[in-house]
Swiss-Prot record:
InterPro entries: CHUP1/IPGA1-like. Keywords: Coiled coil, Cytoplasm, Cytoskeleton. This is INCREASED PETAL GROWTH ANISOTROPY 1-like protein 2. It comes from Arabidopsis thaliana (Mouse-ear cress). Microtubule-associated protein probably involved in the regulation of microtubule organization. The gene is IPGAL2. Residues 221-236, 256-272 have a biased composition (Pro residues).
Length: 558
């Protein structure tokens, strides 16, 4: 009982459990004398022989049994009543578990709400990010449009500056030409005034001459009558008196008659009057000479001025016309950009989306596209303002042009027919030129195939015609047919040369035929049986001393 009282400070629920498990699991407790329960240890001392000690041991055993019964009785009662103790102390635990479940549910609901809010926020964030991206794309598009507008404005400003500079230069040229015309007119006016003065002075000179003649006739003696005297030869001028010479000149001269050339220098005059009269003769002649020179100079000057005027006018007209044409061209380009935007966008879509099954479709599409673009004022200047697929359009046009040229060559080779009326030299040269053209075209096609076939495939343009089994094969077959025509013409010419018995002509024709056959063999990779038969026929018509060498050559060709 003392052991139970010492452990009463712990709760009854725990104490009962501990006492139950301790009774079951713990070994027997020690006795008061310190001995543990269990098997007694053997000792060398025999207790049976000592009656006093034997009695004390028996008493101790009785006491320990009683104590054990006293200790185990309440423990057994507690173990029997344990479910009641558990029920008594287990009931208050139920509200604690309900509260924990409610808290768990509340925390779970709060976590769900938080999760939902997070999901809503994430959705809003995704929507906002998409809106931001769309706005950024719109901003970039607006920036590109703004840059294009700025570039177009810069180009228009440059064009306006050029036009203004051209106008300023044209005005400067016009003003300089007009300033050059003014001195010419002033010069002409001054010359006209000089001419008027000379004419007036010349009209005054006959009056002075008449007065001088009258005075000289008064001073001179009367001359004999001409009827009485025989006609005498004219005297030298230096022997004739000045008065008589003046009288005769005045009688024969009229105011409008041209003056005579000046006489040789006379001897010193005897009279001062004659000296004065002779001194008055030279100024009119010199003045007339100067007048004529001035007239000639004025004519030359007027012609040069007129020529300069015509040149200046033509230059001015050309400058003005060029400015007008340029301005009209720019206006037409601007009008096409503003009014034909839809039309050009439709063309862009067709170029990007059209698919082709063969090259015939490509040629038709390229022809149609060229006709549509021909309606623009300036194709390149207008299309650079749009997102024109220039690379694909150029590739389509390149493929169409190359295929058209090859098809034309193949048709020309296959449809060639020899005209016997044409001289054989001209006919053979024409066929050789066709073979040269075929070789050049095939080499060009091979280069184009190596450089552009990948781009053709990217743009979905047919490439079968570029292969060896396409146009190359057709052209080679046509060249073999051309070689057969060449051999037949050479054979005919050899027959005519045999009739004429010309060995040099035969040998030259043979060399030409074999050379052409060899070139065709190398180009086409062989000859057909008909061409080989024609070559054999040529070999049969060759002279005997040349037949062996040519036969070996023909064998190599076959």
């Amino acid at each position: 009982m003392s052991r139970i009282s010492t452990t009463s400070t712990t709760p009854s629920r725990v104490r009962a459990a501990n006492s139950h498990y301790s009774v079951i699991s713990k070994p027997r407790a020690q006795d008061d004398n310190g001995l543990t329960g269990g098997k007694p240890k053997s000792s060398g001392y025999d207790v049976k022989n000592d009656p006093a000690k034997r009695r004390s041991i028996l008493l101790k055993r009785a006491k320990s049994a009683e104590e054990e019964m006293a200790v185990l009785a309440p423990q057994r009662a507690r173990s029997v009543n344990r479910p009641a103790v558990v029920e008594q102390f287990g009931c208050p635990r139920r509200p604690i578990s309900r509260k924990s479940e409610e808290t768990v549910m509340a925390t779970a609901a709060a976590e769900d709400e938080k999760r939902k809010r997070m999901e809503e926020l994430e959705e809003k964030l995704v929507v906002n990010e998409s809106l931001i991206k769309d706005l950024q794309l719109q901003v970039l598009n607006l920036k590109t449009e703004l840059e294009e507008a700025r570039n177009s404005n810069v180009e228009l400003e440059l064009n306006n500056r050029k036009l203004s500079q051209d106008l300023v230069s044209a005005e400067a040229k016009i003003s300089s030409l007009s300033s050059n015309d003014k001195p010419a007119k002033e010069h002409q006016n001054s010359r006209f005034k000089d001419i008027q003065r000379l004419i007036a002075s010349k009209l005054e000179q006959p009056k002075v001459k008449k007065e001088v003649a009258v005075e000289s006739s008064r001073l001179s003696p009367p001359s004999p009558s001409p009827s009485r005297l025989p006609p005498t030869p004219p005297l030298p001028k230096f022997l004739v008196s000045p008065a008589s010479s003046l009288g005769k000149r005045d009688e024969n001269s009229s105011p409008f008659a041209p003056p005579t050339p000046p006489p040789p220098p006379p001897p010193p005059p005897p009279r001062p009057l004659a000296k004065a009269a002779r001194a008055q003769k030279s100024p009119p002649v010199s003045q007339l000479f100067q007048l004529l020179n001035k007239q000639d100079n004025s004519r030359n000057l007027s012609q040069s001025v007129n020529g300069n005027k015509s040149q200046v006018n033509s230059a001015h007209n050309s400058i003005v016309g060029e400015i007008q044409n340029r301005s009209a061209h720019l206006i037409a380009i601007k009008a096409d950009i503003e009014t034909k935007g839809e039309f050009i966008n439709d063309l862009i879509q067709k170029v990007l989306t059209t698919c082709f099954s063969d090259m015939e479709d490509v040629m038709k599409f390229v022809d149609w596209l060229d006709k549509e673009l021909a309606t623009l004022a300036d194709e390149r200047a207008v299309l650079k303002h749009f997102k024109w697929p220039e690379k694909k359009a150029d590739t389509l046009q390149e493929a169409a042009v190359e295929y058209r040229e090859l098809k034309k060559l193949e048709k020309e080779l296959s449809s060639y027919s020899d005209d016997p009326n044409i001289h054989y030299g001209v006919a053979l040269k024409k066929m050789a030129n066709l073979l040269d053209k075929s070789e050049q075209r095939i080499r060009r096609l091979v280069r184009l195939r190596g450089s552009s076939m990948r781009s053709y495939q990217d743009f979905k343009i047919p490439v079968e015609w570029m292969l060896d089994s396409g146009m190359i094969c057709k052209i080679k077959r046509a060249s073999i047919k051309l070689a057969k025509t060449y051999m037949n013409r050479v054979a005919n010419e050899l027959q005519s040369a045999r009739n004429l018995d010309r060995e040099s002509t035969k040998e030259a024709l043979l060399l030409q035929g074999v050379r052409f056959a060899y070139r065709t063999h190398q180009f086409a990779g062989g000859l057909d049986p008909e061409t080989l038969c024609a070559l054999e026929e040529i070999k049969q018509r060759v002279p005997s001393h040349l037949r062996l060498a040519r036969g070996n050559m023909a064998g190599n060709l076959s």
